[in-house]
């Protein structure tokens, strides 16, 4: 029996568009909506977390980890292999409204649109979230990786209350706890982190290849406080109380700096 292809995404001259969210295509969509600038790349997963099927991944060109290969009975076979490793989740966000956590696998949403614009390099996603019988939100997420200054990335969250009144909490920062799926664990050990309500930074190193990644984020748009956790997460928490028609936004600019070789390690502090 012959195979028949179905067209899930809309294709435009400069855009790929997803109209409506189908969980069956979640991981495929994450691949299609990936961003990269040859220095770093990030899959198109949901910033706010998602309890359905997902493969979160953010990668740095040339940043790898090593592992042993099961010994072969034949000569000349590899005993050690290197692989590009999942690094920091620099779009890490957790959103709560009136005590309800945003999770597209569980929440009632409508008017979902996600698109990537190849002319501008911008990935955007928007939808309406019905929090409860009285409260409804419109949310827009945007992100990009810089082509001019490859160490820089950006993300923006915009919200508008369509009805009701909302007490909104946004936890945003840098998450170095994400596992490398093939290994089933995070391949980094945290070296240091700091948070102050407006910025956060974290540094971590791979266990075997001894490669280091420094990530820092600066935020603006909402009042923030440091969010303390014992995990390898550097994040702040932002709060806004909004009535119907009111808007709020939170922007972040992220810097990612690698130490992958002898020269980069020697100049790491200066960079």
Each language-model region and where it sits:
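Beta-sandwich/jelly-roll carbohydrate-recognition scaffolds of carbohydrate-active enzymes
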Residues: 2-271
